[in-house]
């Protein structure tokens, strides 16, 4: 017994020493015990039943740590691998080989500690338990004991007060992203700006030759290391409703594909160019990370472009992979991704309750939470730059059909779903049962406050400008009603423009958005350039052919500005110098052509005024009456009804929209009653006419023969009267059926109304 213990301690020395270098301490030997599951969390639906799974969807492990028994509750990660996942390696000759393994099974989990409200875990069960878990502000690292067959594991405690030997610092390139202008807000725009709407970052990771040599034998060793990192990053970002999904890895086996300079900034520029020109030709992704095992002669451990998500060249990061602890590297990856999503370093008073934040500048220990400052910066970034690539869902259409409590989807039988217990921060929802807590009426929504539905008439979405309406709660739903705005064509900005889809587009504002606040609209003479029919002057683009503007439409083609600066990020600008014959002066006419946008935002925005009662629409200057449909809103509110863009009555602020709905409801009932009465009367008349006709026929049968009767045809204006020799009976005609006429325009007597 004693020799065995001594031998085990000898084996543990290098493993423990390695962790001390990283700054962890207080190791403890544990033997995790797998527990049987008492109940399943799913709702009875099956998923991929035809596939034999090696790893279970849900696990429970008991760990005795510091004289306390912890129960680790783990759920298999479902969203950190994309359905189009690929792996690329290189031969000795430099040839790229790409495979698309159908990964139907993996051993990566996320979870929490049972009965510990503020806890989280990111664990791999591939060969024992390996990963990270947290209880309140204390963080732990667990991994199997090397060369042990008895199931022993080591648990290390991160010391929050001792900085790491390899302390973290990062840098950002000097890069400023311009806000994205647009002629109107699309459904995509509203989704990307929605804080509660789920977003997806399709992540691609490249490992350089040094990382491969250190971890790449066999290949699945490096793969599992990268998967563990992404599982950790995904766990962190799910708190922001972002799913970080790995869509591919590329391993630079045998040699690096770019020169890794001693300057990390130069290396980032070189890598950005390579991934755009080479990697993007064979794989689609939102963000790419280079894991480099080289020191790069710098204390900086990571670098990225601030706010570069979804942009060509700029959605790129580099992380130094110099430490064996994947959680530290993953935390740095999450940190750099935060910069790419518009987040800055946290400085006092931006703090997190659990101590460290993801965006702390030192990044010395794993952090799982974002400060309020980081969250606000991210939400502002969504509004300003609209990174629409984050709306693409990298999973099959039926991926979310697997229903269970904790998937953040409101499935059948659920009143709320705030995600797994370790992620749920909603005080209104019971994360274990997915029902509202006693006494509460709602869990989320603009009309939900303190877990109760707001009263009718409360403003849930204030008016953005003079072309918008404030939305008010209905009193019976936690959701804010659909956004309504003033009817298209309503004069705005002192009659300089007309309202269009809730905005007041003008050329002055568009010039400011394209360039900067110093830019203004140029002289009218510039718009003659739109008759040229090239990329800097046209009205319509059909199959990449630039069609020149007609004379009446020149103010609806490319916009021309003067002053201001253009970021090279958007595209190239062109300045023409034209002579103003009236003032004998030179006029500057500046416009823009985008490199990579499908919609040319250099065209005059739709809805922009191009004359009195005229607006631009698809490169034409048209009368508003032809473009917009308006409505005279009846008095459906208590007072002051206004036309809305959806041809609906919109109540003024302070009135509950219920008043509109009730009035419309009464109106609809009144119309229905009138229609029913008319139908009943019509049926009654029809019955009487049929009975009358039967009576006439009966009299004709019973009466003795009489001489022929002549009847004057009142609908005939000829020289002779028409004589009928048969009984005259009333006939039934549809009220809207016109009498037929002969070639002279005279009505047929048989078709005349009786």
UniProtKB/Swiss-Prot annotation:
Annotated consequence of substituting residue 106 to Y: In a cutaneous metastatic melanoma sample; somatic mutation
SUPFAM superfamilies referenced in this protein's UniProt entry, alphabetically: Blood coagulation inhibitor (disintegrin) (SSF57552), Metalloproteases ('zincins'), catalytic domain (SSF55486)
Residue positions the entry lists as glycosylated: 84, 167, 174, 184, 584, 668
Transmembrane segments: 669-689
Keyword match Disulfide bond: yes
Protein's UniProt keywords contain Magnesium: no
Location of the protein in the cell: Membrane
Propeptide cleavage-removed residue intervals: 19-176
Keywords: Disulfide bond, Glycoprotein, Membrane, Signal, Transmembrane, Transmembrane helix
Extracellular side: 19-668
Main location: membrane
Protein name (record): Disintegrin and metalloproteinase domain-containing protein 7
């Amino acid at each position: 017994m004693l020799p065995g213990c001594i031998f085990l301690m000898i084996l543990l020395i290098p493993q423990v020493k390695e962790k001390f270098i990283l700054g962890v301490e207080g190791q403890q030997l544990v033997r995790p015990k797998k527990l049987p599951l008492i109940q399943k969390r799913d709702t009875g639906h099956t998923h991929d039943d035809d596939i034999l799974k090696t790893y279970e969807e849900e696990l429970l492990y008991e760990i005795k740590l510091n004289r306390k028994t912890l129960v680790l509750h783990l759920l298999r990660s479902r969203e950190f691998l994309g359905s189009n996942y690929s792996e690329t390696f290189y031969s000795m000759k430099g040839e790229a080989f790409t495979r698309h393994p159908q990964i139907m099974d993996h051993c990566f989990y996320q979870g929490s500690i049972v009965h510990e409200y503020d806890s989280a875990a990111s664990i791999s069960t591939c060969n024992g338990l390996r990963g990270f878990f947290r209880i309140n502000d204390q963080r732990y690292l667990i991994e199997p004991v090397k060369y042990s067959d008895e199931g022993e594991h080591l648990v290390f405690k991160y010391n929050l007060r001792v900085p790491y030997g390899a302390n973290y610092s990062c840098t950002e390139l000097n890069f400023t992203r311009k806000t994205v202008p647009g002629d109107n807000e699309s459904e995509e725009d509203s989704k990307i700006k929605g804080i509660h709407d789920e977003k997806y970052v399709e992540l691609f990771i490249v490992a350089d030759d040094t990382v491969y040599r250190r971890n790449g034998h066999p290949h699945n060793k490096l793969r599992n290391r990268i998967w563990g990192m992404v599982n950790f990053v995904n766990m962190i970002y799910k708190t922001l409703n972002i799913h970080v999904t790995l869509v591919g890895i590329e391993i630079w086996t045998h040699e690096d594909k770019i020169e890794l300079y001693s300057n990390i900034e130069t290396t980032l520029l070189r890598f950005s160019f390579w991934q755009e020109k080479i990697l993007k030709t064979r794989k689609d992704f939102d963000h790419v990370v280079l894991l480099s095992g080289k020191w790069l002669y710098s204390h900086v451990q990571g670098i990225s472009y601030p706010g570069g998500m979804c942009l060509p060249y700029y959605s790129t990061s580099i992380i130094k992979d110099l430490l064996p602890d994947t959680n530290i590297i993953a935390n740095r990856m999450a940190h750099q991704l935060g910069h790419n999503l518009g987040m800055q370093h946290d400085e006092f008073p931006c703090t997190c309750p659990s101590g460290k934040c993801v965006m702390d500048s030192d990044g010395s220990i794993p952090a799982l939470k974002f400060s309020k400052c980081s969250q606000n910066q991210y939400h502002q970034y969504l509004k300003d730059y609209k990174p629409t690539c984050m709306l693409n869902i990298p999973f099959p259409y039926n991926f979310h059909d697997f229903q269970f409590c904790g998937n953040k989807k409101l499935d059948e039988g659920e009143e709320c779903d705030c995600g797994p217990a370790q992620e749920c921060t909603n005080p209104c929802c019971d994360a274990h049962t997915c029902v509202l807590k006693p006494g509460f009426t709602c869990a989320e929504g603009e009309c939900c406050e303190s877990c109760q539905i707001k009263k009718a008439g409360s403003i849930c979405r204030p008016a953005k400008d003079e072309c918008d309406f404030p939305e008010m709660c209905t009193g019976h739903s936690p959701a804010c009603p659909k956004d309504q705005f003033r009817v298209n064509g309503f004069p705005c900005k002192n009659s300089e423009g007309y309202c269009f889809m809730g905005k007041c587009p003008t050329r002055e504002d568009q010039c400011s958005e394209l360039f900067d606040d110093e830019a203004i609209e140029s002289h009218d003479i510039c718009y003659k350039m739109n008759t040229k029919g090239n990329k800097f002057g046209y009205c319509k683009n059909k199959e990449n052919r630039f069609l020149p503007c007609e004379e009446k439409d020149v103010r609806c083609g490319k916009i021309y500005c003067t002053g201001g600066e253009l970021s090279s990020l958007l595209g190239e600008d062109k300045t023409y110098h034209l002579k103003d014959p009236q003032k004998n002066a030179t006029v500057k006419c500046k416009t823009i052509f985008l490199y990579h946008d499908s919609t040319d935002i250099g065209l005059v925005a739709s809805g922009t005024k191009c004359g009195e009662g005229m607006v631009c629409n698809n490169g034409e200057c048209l009368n508003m009456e032809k473009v917009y449909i308006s409505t005279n809103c009846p008095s459906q509110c208590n007072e002051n009804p206004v036309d809305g863009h959806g041809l609906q009555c919109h109540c003024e602020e302070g009135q509950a929209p219920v008043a509109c709905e009730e009035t419309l409801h009464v109106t609809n009932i009144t119309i229905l009653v009138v229609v029913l009465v008319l139908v009943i009367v019509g049926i009654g008349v029809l019955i009487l006419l049929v009975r009358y006709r039967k009576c006439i026929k009966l009299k004709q049968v019973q009466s003795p023969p009489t001489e022929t009767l002549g009847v004057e045809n009142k609908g005939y204006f000829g020289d002779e009267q028409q004589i009928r020799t048969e009984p005259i009976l009333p006939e039934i005609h549809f009220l809207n059926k016109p009498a037929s006429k002969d070639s002279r325009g005279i009505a047929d007597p048989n078709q005349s109304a009786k």
